[in-house]
Amino acid sequence: MAVSLRSSIAKRRSHLNAPLCVFTQSCKGLGLNKREIESITQVVFPTHQDEFQHAEVLVVLGSYKATQYKMPTAVRLYKEKKVSKLLLSGGNLAIDQKPEFESMKEYALDNGVPDSDIILERHAKNTVENAQYSSEIIVESEIAKRSVAILTTAFHIKRAKYLFKNALPQYLELHSYFVNDRSTRRDNWWLTESAISRVMHSHEVIKRLGVKPYA
């Protein structure tokens, strides 16, 4: 994993005459074989949603395109009364060049979530900080006394859930819900270098943390 992604791909090309991809006619020359794809997919991606009846707060982890891929599901879960409040976490810039928390809040307000049910975490720059800062808000404000849910992308959910589980008090039951973006799904992530980079980063972190299989 120390070798850069581009160098690794170039090295694979030199000794693999025809990369074998199980899910597609062409791997676009990226050099991942069937066994590698299946192994990495199994480690990184969940196979099913974490079923839950209700959570007092849903933490939505910010990202560049959170309003496109995450917030529609967050609002739906809120309107279905699966969650009572939305905690929007992230201080990086979103696609509209606003902080993630601000961009996500605007989406929630525009789609019928009242301001009184929106909590903001304004500073997190990575998943560790998402978990740490959001957990501090949850405990200090006492917005959840029984259960918390988190929402992020499929390739991100395993490590995010692990970090939140370790950051939250043990008395809080933790649930998770994942969404898919266009290019980093369990059925297409190996087709572009950017998606491979995201998945391989998650793969490395999951292995390093010792995250157990998704259940």
Outline where the language-model segments fall:
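C-terminal capping/extension of enzyme domains
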Residues: 183-215
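A structural signal for short, hydrophobic/glycine-enriched beta-strand patches
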Residues: 31-191
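Basic polycationic patches enriched in arginine
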Residues: 6, 12-13
